Structures are given as structure tokens and as C-alpha cells.
């Protein structure tokens, strides 16, 4: 038997000066143009021109369009993850303090963050498990402001099943974009 050493074709380099310059320019533009710049880049790269923040009306419309089998499956997964997260919090979340030496104390106190950003991949497939795992656990932990973010499909926006799942699991805001610059200005991060 003969084993050949084959090399994959070279891909575009990300370690050259021109690439770094392009990325730095994009990031600088995003810092100054904020949501407008994000919308422009989403239009350019993702071929999506819709709203960045998914409205309550759109969520309700999507909820009605999802078939019952999918809804049942998502609810089943959500319930399982929620039950486990609650048990984990109950059994792991015990605060404690010990005196290591006279006057020197160490301990643990679990405090949820105010805001959690939950990225939900949405390339060729709707990765609803990412929505279930990240949004549900943040909700159980007591996070007050949960923002779910998923990339858009051309001319569609985020996958409807991702939007349905993020909403069911307790996301407070659902955005369609790749960047954190699309967080609503009302968020306290």
C-alpha cells in the first residue's frame, strides 16, 4: 500500500499586511458609525437589509409559523436543560466563606452578570441547541438582560427556528448580526 502526502490547497492568507489593514479599517469604521455601519456591512457581506433587532411582532409571526413537532422538540430540550441548570445551581451555587488564617477570609459567592450576550450560530444550519444551552442557563442563573444574536441568511434574517427558540428560552432581545455593536443602546453591559 502506498500512502501519498497530499497538501490542501492554500487558502487566503490572514497574516498579511493588507488583510490586517482591511480589518483595522472595518473595525475603526464600526466604532464611529455604530449601528449604521453594522447595517452597511451586514448588507454588503450577508446580503441582508432587514431590522437588526427582531420586533415582538416578528417573533409572534414566527411563533405561529413553526410546526408543532419542532415546537415540542424545542420545549423538550429547553425543559431538560432548565431542570439540569436549576439542579446545578442548587447544588453548586452554595456560597461559603472560610478563615484561612486569623483575619484572612476567602470564599465564594456566585453572582449573575447583568447582561449576557448569547451567540447562536446560524450558517447553513439552525443551531438551536446553542440557543437552548446559552439562553436557558443564563435565565436560570438570574441574568437580568439576555441578548441573543444570530447571523442573518441573505434576504431572510436569522433562522426562524433560532428566533423561536431564543424567545422560548427567555431572551430579552434578539438581534440579527455578527457584531456586538448592534446591542441596543439601552443595554447596561
Show the residue positions of the predicted features.
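Alpha-helical hinge/cap motifs
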Residues: 34, 142, 180-184
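Conserved small-residue-rich beta-alpha loop and adjacent elements
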Residues: 98-165
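A glycine-rich helix N-cap at a beta->alpha junction
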Residues: 165-178
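Conserved small/polar residues in nucleotide/adenosyl-binding loops
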Residues: 1-5, 179-185
